[in-house]
């Protein structure tokens, strides 16, 4: 029986030094000449789910309480939950099990292979972001983690600020 080969949509021109195979994804762990950052990290191999339900308050996927208001986020047990609107939450399994399957309940859609997921981390991240979008990641009214739904370099996407320090 042949195995599925999954390929990330992210291609960087640097040479991989260390790679790992995870659930049929070739994951680069380290690149030659990485430097001090900031870093663009490909998380496309991490399981991602869309959850839609008219009563999201009654659902606790992966044992976490979902955020109540659109734009709010919860990072708990390695799962990032982004409240999109009244009836929709995006779920990102960031550091849990690689093979975390889709919950066996109605309302869940696996979007892992139909979406791209990257993280921009390190010092000076926000100085890069301000050149690519008009969204205010340092808005004093917003407490991290929080979600923006908007264009980033003209690409519609979800943008999550996990902290405002920019170096953590």
What positions do the PLM features span?
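Basic, glycine/lysine-rich polyanion-binding surfaces/domains
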Residues: 1-168
């Amino acid at each position: 029986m042949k195995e599925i080969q999954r390929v990330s949509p992210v291609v960087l021109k640097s040479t991989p030094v260390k790679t790992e195979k995870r659930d049929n994804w070739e994951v680069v762990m380290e690149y030659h000449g990485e430097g001090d950052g900031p870093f663009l990290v490909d998380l496309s191999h991490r399981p991602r789910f869309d959850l839609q339900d008219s009563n999201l308050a009654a659902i606790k996927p992966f044992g976490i309480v979902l955020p109540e208001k659109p734009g709010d986020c919860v990072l708990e047990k390695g799962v990032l939950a982004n409240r999109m609107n009244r009836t929709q939450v995006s779920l990102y399994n960031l550091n849990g099990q690689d093979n975390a399957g889709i919950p066996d309940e109605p309302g869940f859609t696996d979007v892992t292979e139909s979406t791209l997921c990257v993280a921009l981390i390190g010092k000076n991240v926000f100085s890069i972001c301000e050149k690519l979008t008009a969204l205010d990641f340092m808005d004093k009214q917003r407490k991290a983690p929080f979600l923006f739904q908007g264009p980033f370099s003209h690409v519609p996407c979800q943008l999550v600020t996990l902290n405002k320090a920019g170096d953590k």
